Amino acid sequence: MKKIIALLLAVVMVFALVACASGSKTDAPATDTPATETPAADEAPAAETTGERLYIPVMAKGFQHQFWQAVAAGSAAAAEDYNVEIYFDGPASETEIDAQVNMVKNELAKNPKAMALAALSTDAVTEILEECAEKNIPVIGFDSGVPGDTTGAVKATACTNNENAAAIAADKFNENETVVEAMKNATSDNPVIIGCLSQDAVSASVTGRTTGFVDEMAKIAETYQPGKVSIEGHAKWEKKVDAPAIIIEVAISATTEATAVQTAANSLLGMNPVAIFCSNEGAVTGFLAAVSDGEDLAEGGKYAGLVVAGFDAGAAQKNAVRQGWFYGSVTQDPYQIGYKAVELAVKAANGEAVEDVDTGAQWYDASNIDDEMIALLVYD
């Protein structure tokens, strides 16, 4: 219990720091996959020092979602535990690739001992990674990391296994009576639609979740309607069949902006689906805008009976889950993503061998959202 209270206090303290200045320096800033327990301060080995603490910039994809504030909290806790100095920053939104590149360049000019990076575009930071490799500055990816890096600078990544995490939502749909009965009774004359709403088809984390959900949902659907499951909506996932009884419709918004996601959500809702999975907080935000902040999902509402699962957290999503408007959601452990990113960076800076870390995922719904361990993961 003491550790839980300590973690909660750390989260609250760093949220306050992030709110004041997004780029300020801080001295301390299917089956559910179990979240990794954060090591206590007395369990962390001391960082190698030569009179000054290690300096490690932690460059995020943005502050657009509260997810990143929880990541910042974890990175600050690790900085305190390992006695290192970090600088956590990111662009205002996840569309500002040039802004992130400039931030990373500025930090590289300070010759840090290591760097943690969640790149908006691997291509855009390739030259920076090459310089890191030349200077022997190890890079640790976090969240979606730096997919496809060919420079050798990226030594490991702290992230959720997104495919496994999203598959949890598909498995939960298979436990829902409404969805199961619809799949059992589906016909080619009256096919059942199950939707997947994603804000893009580029980000490694979002595409991984889309793939994980679609593949697992298709596998499940095949057990009810063999040979009659069609995946449609986007070329990256499309596997059409003739006369389908179940259609898994992949809806990708034109941009990551909330209004664009809302438009994609409205199109999906117009197909009269039995269930929809929203693959990140951005998808959830756009979807909720399309259903009157969730009220259209309530009893007597326009979309009452629609089974919806989300991903990540945020105040609006938590409210939808708590109200019973959402069937439930999958949460990553953003605190652990930040913590493990800094932990790996410290180890790499000290010459230790490092490897990828799966930071875990959990399902939460109205029945467990207030449980102590879930409450640590579902940020506002």
Feature-to-residue mapping (PLM):
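A residue-level marker of the well-folded mature domains of exported/periplasmic proteins
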Residues: 20-380
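Sec-dependent N-terminal signal peptides of Gram-positive bacterial secreted proteins and lipoproteins
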Residues: 4-23
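A general lysine-centric signal
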Residues: 2-3, 61
